[in-house]
Amino acid sequence: MIMSLGPYASFIVTSYAAAALVVAILIGWIATDYRSQTRRLRDLDRSGITRRSGRSAMDRP
């Protein structure tokens, strides 16, 4: 199936390619940041620092 995009074909194809590239970069950035945050939380848990959500009401000052 071949589509005729007319005289604006290069603009349309370039726009879709740019949008796809931006989405791919954002997905990569989010995946990298997720791994980084998970690693930081694991390191903090190992060092003994607990999360606020893990504390009970009696632990608060």
Swiss-Prot record:
InterPro entries: Haem_export_protD_CcmD
Listed Pfam families: CcmD
UniProt GO BP: cytochrome complex assembly; heme transport
TM spans (from-to): 11-31
Bilayer topology: Single-pass membrane protein
Localization per Swiss-Prot or TrEMBL: Cell inner membrane
GO cellular component: plasma membrane
Keywords: Cell inner membrane, Cell membrane, Cytochrome c-type biogenesis, Membrane, Transmembrane, Transmembrane helix, Transport
Primary role: Required for the export of heme to the periplasm for the biogenesis of c-type cytochromes.
Family note: Belongs to the CcmD/CycX/HelD family.
Name of the protein: Heme exporter protein D
Gene: cycX
